[in-house]
Amino acid sequence: MISKINFVKMHGLGNDFVIVNKRDLSSSYDLSQLAKNMAERHTGIGCDQFIIYEEHNDFYEMIIYNIDGSSAKLCGNATRCLAKLIYLDTGKQDITVMVGNKKLLCNVNDENNISVNVGSVSFNEAWMPNRDKVWEFAERYMIDLKETICVDIGNPHVVIFSKLEPQDQKIVGERLQAKELFADGVNVNFAEVKDNKIYLSVWERGAGLTLACGSGACGSFAAGLKRGFIHSPSTIVFKHGNLTMKEENGNIIMQGAATLVARGEYYCEQ
C-alpha cells in the first residue's frame, strides 16, 4: 500500500530539512525509519535532519530526527525554518517552539530575518569523559585542550578553537563519537576567531559535517564569550551565510535567514 505524505523542504544557510506536520502522519508509521527513508538523498527527498511538528494551544512542538534515525534534542537552524514556515502559513510573528522541555522563543521580523532565543547554556562538564582519555586523544590530533570547551545548549557540544584542516575535522568528528569518550556521542565544533567573528564548521552527531549548525553557532558563541575571545554581539560565519549572535541577561539569541525550497508529496510504501 502506498500513502502520500505532504512535506516542506527548507534550509538554514545550507543546513537542510524535510518538515512534516504531524497531522499528516498516521500512527502506523515507524518514524525513525521514515526519517531515514526521506533523508536519503538518492532515493528520498534528502536532508540533514527530518522534522515533525505539531500545533498546540500556545506553542508548537518540534521533534527532530537525524539521518541515521536517531533523535536530536535541539536544532537552531530547524527552529528558524519552522518559525518561518509557521509565519508563512499563519502570519504569526511571535512563535514558541518546544523541543522536549526546551522552550525556544522565536520572532519573525521579516521573511529573511528570524531570531530565536535559545535561553541559557551550561558549562557543567559532568558528561565529559575522563580527562586522561581526552588528553591522549587531543595529543594524537594536536588539539590544544586549553582552547577546547564543552557546552550544553540543550544538546552537547565540544568547541575546539584549534585550527584543523577539513580532512582532520572529519576524522576528529567521527572519532569523538567513540563510546569510551562520549557515551551518547557529541557535536564537534571547529572554531576560528578573527575580528570578533567565529568561522565555524560543525560535525553533527548523527549527521556528520553539515554546511551550518544553529545550535553549534549558539554553543560556540557562548564558549567564545566565556574564553574572552569575542564580545556580544558577534557574527558566526558559515560557507553559505552568517548568523548574528548576542547575549541578553544570560540568554543566547540567534538571528538569521531561513529559506523555503519546496512543498510536495512523498510517496511512502507501508
UniProtKB/Swiss-Prot annotation:
The keyword rRNA-binding does not apply. The keyword Cytoplasm applies. GO terms for cellular component: cytosol. It is found in: Cytoplasm. The record marks H157, E204 as: Could be important to modulate the pK values of the two catalytic cysteine residues. PROSITE patterns: DAP_EPIMERASE. The active site is at C75, C213. It holds the Pfam family DAP_epimerase. One of its GO terms (biological process) is lysine biosynthetic process via diaminopimelate. Pathway: Amino-acid biosynthesis; L-lysine biosynthesis via DAP pathway; DL-2,6-diaminopimelate from LL-2,6-diaminopimelate: step 1/1. Catalyzes the stereoinversion of LL-2,6-diaminopimelate (L,L-DAP) to meso-diaminopimelate (meso-DAP), a precursor of L-lysine and an essential component of the bacterial peptidoglycan. Belongs to the diaminopimelate epimerase family. This is Diaminopimelate epimerase.
